[in-house]
Amino acid sequence: MFDIHREELDWGGRTLTLETGKMARQADGSVLATYGDTKVLATVVSAREPKPGQDFFPLTVNYQEKTYAAGRIPGGYFKREGRPSEKETLVSRLIDRPIRPLFPEGYKCDTQVVITVLAHDLENDPDVVAMVAASAALTLSGVPFMGPVGAARVGFIDNEYVLNPTVDEVKESALELVVAGTGDAVLMVESEAKELPEEIMLGAVMFGHRHFQPVIEAIIKLAEKAAKEPRNFQPADVSEVESKVREIAEADLRAAYKIKQKQDRYAAVGAAKSKVKKYYEELALDGTKVPTAQVVSDVLKALEAKIVRWNILDDGIRIDGRDVYTVRPIVSEVGILPRAHGSALFTRGETQALVVATLGTGEDEQFIDSLEGTYKEHFLLHYNFPPFSVGETGRMGSPGRREIGHGKLAWRAIHPMLPAKHEFPYTLRVVSEILESNGSSSMATVCGTSLALMDAGVPLRRPVAGIAMGLILEGEKFAVLSDILGDEDHLGDMDFKVAGTEQGVTSLQMDIKIAGITEEIMKVALTQAKDGRVHILGEMAKALTTARAELGEHAPRIEVMKIAVDKIREVIGSGGKVIREIVEKTGAKINIEDDGTIKIASASGDAIKAAINWIKSIASEPEVGQIYEGTVVKVVDFGAFVNFFGSKDGLVHVSQMANERVAKPSDVVKEGDKVKVKLMGFDERGKTRLSMKVVDQTTGEDLEAKAKAERDAARAAAPAATGDEAGAAE
């Protein structure tokens, strides 16, 4: 019934198995990949013909994690998987990026790649396994795919590269890098690092590329046994269209791409394209067969790319007039929003990000439900890209894949520089609003986030900056471009973004569109990126060099205290009654952890102090000799009872109310009065003895201690005085 084919190899100390022919047989291609006990099923279906008028390649990649893969049931009311999680969205992009460039130009058949995690052993992250499975399924499917693609995760532990580190090993690693590519080229890199030098980062890329070659060989062997007949796809011959388009528009396009201002340049480019469109419309009116609008558009794009690329390679001059090294003018401002805890406006050329930082408490942490279990995230970074930022109208609403991906890239850049949670126990939410965009808005977000957090008083280890780089390669000639524009991103051969501090890289993202980019070229690019990053850090320093010494005026203050674990129940109370009362009466937010750590937060210092004292009164015992502020709760003939330590009461005997004789306690105090008392001790029955007369009721000073200090000072002075008098008598 089943025609099963399988390939196995030892990879990173674990067995990788690729199997086809048993599951999802009606898909064009399907592969079950097993690594350890992690199992991932990848399927590919591609339409036989493109839709009429289709003007782009409709590739969709959907990565989905099923909770049954880890033996869990989904949370929520409906108890089933819902909208994609952030991780599912990010992994979908991770798979899409290396496979998309490997489809031939002009292929426009609707193609869907679906990857499903069927089992997760909680040791081997399914994302790399999913990339391998998707590559294998595409290779077997018969669709025109110039793969296969391999992928690997690389760690850096104890100064050694580690292939496919486990989930636990990643936590100890100074680097988490995912690399994908073909047999002779790297296509995609995604990473987070702890200020590593460029040579370590590049070494990790090449290490991963070497070590996924056996995976590519296994996919090829599987394809030799089980691949479907390749589909016949021939790109249309557009040589005549190319010739005519050059004749009509090349001169105008060359002139347009010498205009430095983006909107004016776009207008001139649009006018040149309109001339071509008008020519073919008039031709069609005469009954002449003309190419489709999409063919003409594709030819125009290719001509634009050629003009821009050779202008740079021949003259070293870019679209906006810069040379290949120059970063656009930068303006950094901080503290621009009066009620925000921290804010920054970062402008680089025609790219601008308004970044706002907000500090919260443990209650504000995000609960994340993953296959590995539920955990809390205390650093959130949200990136928004409204259509007005590029002068367009468009959809507004929940974030798309691109916004989630750019936000995560900036998150990775900043995350290694955050203070440890026990040092700075705040939840941090950063929102980046892209107000203008002409390339590198994610890196503007990195720079703005660094400034906004420092403006909020978050003690980053060092400021972080990011820069987007590009590459143009034609034969032996190449040019690396610093701080690329949006047009240079689309027309170049490599787009890579590097973020970090003056000491090293914290995040690297790379997308390479062609083969032939050598290790040496990447080394040049990374070195040039470092120079650009250091320059940007210098420009940012004009606004702020380090975190402010104090938190923002409107930010909450957090104090941390510790109580015995066996006292947690008393502080919380039956059904949370006690803790709710403390919160309601003091106005402070309180978070209690299982180890007895308590975080008290409020914008008011008095509220924090009141909450701390209340909790102390429950979880600890009063100390003899200490002075406390209390409230008179009852006046009797022989004294007054004072509530002085949370729920604890003590007696101030009438003889301890004042130094002079008191006839009636009610002459001195009444119920509700605030008084200062000293704990004198406990009587034989364990009752608390308090005194008011030994405490200055205005200042709270211990009068007994003051008198003792004066007596001690007098005794110390007496011998000296006696000696002086004896000397004078002689």
Swiss-Prot record:
SUPFAM superfamilies listed in its UniProt record: Eukaryotic type KH-domain (KH-domain type I), Nucleic acid-binding proteins, Ribonuclease PH domain 2-like, Ribosomal protein S5 domain 2-like
Enzyme class: transferase
PROSITE patterns registered for this protein in UniProt: KH_TYPE_1, S1
UniProt keywords, alphabetically: Cytoplasm, Magnesium, Metal-binding, Nucleotidyltransferase, RNA-binding, Transferase
Cofactor (UniProt): Mg(2+)
GO cellular component, one term: cytosol
Molecular functions (GO terms): 3'-5'-RNA exonuclease activity; magnesium ion binding; polyribonucleotide nucleotidyltransferase activity; RNA binding
Region feature Disordered, mapped onto this chain: 700-730
Keyword Metal-binding: yes
Record-linked HAMAP family: PNPase
Family: Belongs to the polyribonucleotide nucleotidyltransferase family.
This protein's name: Polyribonucleotide nucleotidyltransferase
Organismal lineage: Bacteria, Pseudomonadati, Pseudomonadota, Alphaproteobacteria, Hyphomicrobiales
